[in-house]
């Protein structure tokens, strides 16, 4: 029989919401350097402790740099609204504000608009109506998620997001279509409470750009912003916020530096400053403070910040906006730790973002969980397994067995209109994966155990026990849904 394997190492991407950046202008203060050895480059687990200064916990990134002197500012830009960041959040803000009559300046440390990923959710949209997809009822799902978070969430924001999602998505659909983009529906899981679809952008039709077409969407927004007269400035990095009355009044502007020569620009906002500049996953000290569980995955070495990067599993941006907010007295969210964007492996799953729902074993050759979960959930449990590795094991008749249970096979990123995969297509895909090392194939459990470095005798016992439970129709070990 053909046994195939996937390496289900949980891959971690960006953490929490955020901004851009590395060390602020003028370098770190002596106090900051003394506060944390992480300022010298690498951070390790022994550094991940709170530093107490003036009776409060402080990390070095919480300590503000010296203000940029007025005589070093070579240019001043004034407008109604200043938007910091040229991604989806920044450009949707700029376009929406300009449509309502505001004069807007958007500046970004990147050299062009940039975004990544995809999978845009809305409860309903004109595209869904065109395809006959029923609106999503979030109540069971939202309640489940809130309970899982011990209700440490802002319910007003959650429900506002739901209630206004249709209007917002239709707005974006119009902008995308105006620029020549197609808006298609991407399949998601059907076995859990979440929505089983998401909106994606494409220039190819079907699934060619599903989950990667967000760059096309942000470029469409840039074109719309230009038509509306938004002033757009690239290669300019935010350094410090300007807050009146000794950090007790309103935020009135931003000090930024030009990437080309380091000269300083003051952006003055008559109405508001909007921070929309990315995440903080490339500041390892911030990860240690707010999202420590991902540090072993992304590594402890402090990486260089590339504002033009599309994706990087070891961290993207450096949290400049969050730092600037902290320096002028902004509050951090109370829910802790911050939610990382993590994803387990999809090998052997019939769901687009599912996990292999058959037998899973860890490096100790033990079955370690109920397998009927989504890939993101599986990655959390993998973090507690030896080596952060697990193996899904199945036989060549597994595709047909799933079909016999009334399910269908869909892979990640498939357009809603595409037909399900056939067993022959799946086996061919897995065989191709064997050639690249993504899967392992064996005729016996002994051979499989040898390839994977598992205990052959224990693997036979685990498989026998799993088959016994399958025959009973009841998972007496982990109570998985049969």
Task: Report residues per predicted region.
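Conserved redox-cofactor binding core of oxidoreductases
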Residues: 41, 46-49, 161-264, 270, ...
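Glycine-rich FAD pyrophosphate-binding loop
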Residues: 99-116
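An anion/pyrophosphate-binding glycine-rich loop and adjacent beta-alpha core
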Residues: 318, 322, 328-451
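N-terminal secretory signal peptides and thylakoid transit peptides that target proteins
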Residues: 1-11
